[in-house]
């Protein structure tokens, strides 16, 4: 997928507002794990773009994001 859009993600999440919260949680989780935009991917994507792409491509579900947030 060349570009991630909100519409790509809305099939997986009920509302845009939920999408914002979930993508933010996932991006923070990615950064906590030591993600580096320069070292970890050749496209130099930001953590928020990676989070949205994972949601759009069903690599991670909203339930998994919430579970990861609770477990810390």
Curated annotation (Swiss-Prot):
GO terms for biological process: DNA-templated transcription. Keywords: DNA-directed RNA polymerase, Nucleotidyltransferase, Transcription, Transferase. One of its GO terms (molecular function) is DNA binding. Its EC number is 2.7.7.6. It catalyses: RNA(n) + a ribonucleoside 5'-triphosphate = RNA(n+1) + diphosphate. The keyword Disulfide bond does not apply. Gene3D superfamilies: 3.90.940.10. It comes from the Bacteria. One of its GO terms (cellular component) is DNA-directed RNA polymerase complex. The RNAP catalytic core consists of 2 alpha, 1 beta, 1 beta' and 1 omega subunit. When a sigma factor is associated with the core the holoenzyme is formed, which can initiate transcription. Belongs to the RNA polymerase subunit omega family. HAMAP family: RNApol_bact_RpoZ. Promotes RNA polymerase assembly. Latches the N- and C-terminal regions of the beta' subunit thereby facilitating its interaction with the beta and alpha subunits. NCBIfam families: rpoZ. This is DNA-directed RNA polymerase subunit omega. It comes from Francisella philomiragia subsp. philomiragia (strain ATCC 25017 / CCUG 19701 / FSC 153 / O#319-036).
